[in-house]
A protein has these predicted regions:
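Nucleotidyltransferase catalytic core that binds NTPs
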Residues: 1-144
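Hydrophobic faces of well-ordered beta-strands that scaffold small-molecule active sites
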Residues: 5, 33, 160-166, 188-192
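Short amphipathic alpha-helices and their capping/turn segments at secondary-structure boundaries
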Residues: 18-27, 170-185
């Protein structure tokens, strides 16, 4: 019977790094992809462009993927305890930084269930976040913004919106990130009105 290999991923923007780690995982057994749900992602990163079902449709059709299951929590513990894989594969980029605590959790759980953690060298010069920044720079339509807002409200208990009446507050909303207990907190969007815009310029609302 083939060994079970667990690999967690967001799977929104597929690039060579994803394919590389899937192929490496397949060397150890049947690859089970734990695909993060919107709910799992929302409190840590910006929502993916694609819904979970769309991402699942893409990932399950990639060579060497045996199964795709939802990962409803940023922590790997629930799925690892449920599936009890023989191996879990992860890039070595989590040895430091905000995901270091996840690594410690995974090592503890895999030790308890008799599994092994295999760390693969992180693919350099290409990341999903870097590609996402390039896509964001192209801009979005009002329909895309509305769709994202609806998904955010459904996925998060609190949606963080910053009032933005000038370029400075816009930059604050776009770039502010704070690490709290292993979670990355940032603004989900920005909002502006003619009233705040006109007030900042010392003009009545009708002239803004």
């Amino acid at each position: 019977m083939a060994k079970k290999v667990y690999l967690g991923m967001i799977g929104d923007i597929m690039h060579p790094g994803y394919i590389n780690i899937i192929n490496k995982a397949a060397e150890y057994g049947d690859v089970i992809i734990g695909l993060f749900t919107d709910k799992a992602i929302a409190n840590h990163r910006r929502l993916p462009y694609l819904t979970w079902e769309q991402r699942k449709n893409v990932v399950e059709n990639i060579k060497n993927v045996a199964q795709v299951v939802p990962q409803d929590d940023w922590s790997y513990i629930p799925n690892l305890m449920k599936l009890k894989p023989d191996y879990i594969i992860h890039g070595d980029d989590w040895k430091c930084g905000p995901e270091k605590y996840l690594r410690e959790e995974v090592f503890n759980v895999m030790s308890k269930i008799g599994g092994e953690v295999i760390e693969i060298p992180y693919t350099k010069n290409i990341t999903a976040s870097g590609i996402q920044q390039e896509i964001d720079a192209l801009g979005v339509t009002p329909q895309m913004r509305l769709s994202s807002l609806r998904r955010l409200i459904a996925a998060k208990p609190v949606v963080r919106i910053l009032e933005s009446h000038n370029g400075l507050t816009g930059l604050i909303a776009e770039h502010t990130k704070v690490e709290v207990n292993g979670q990355t907190r940032e603004f989900d969007g920005m909002w502006a009105s003619s009233l705040t815009d006109s007030t900042s310029k010392g003009q009545p609302d009708i002239e803004a």
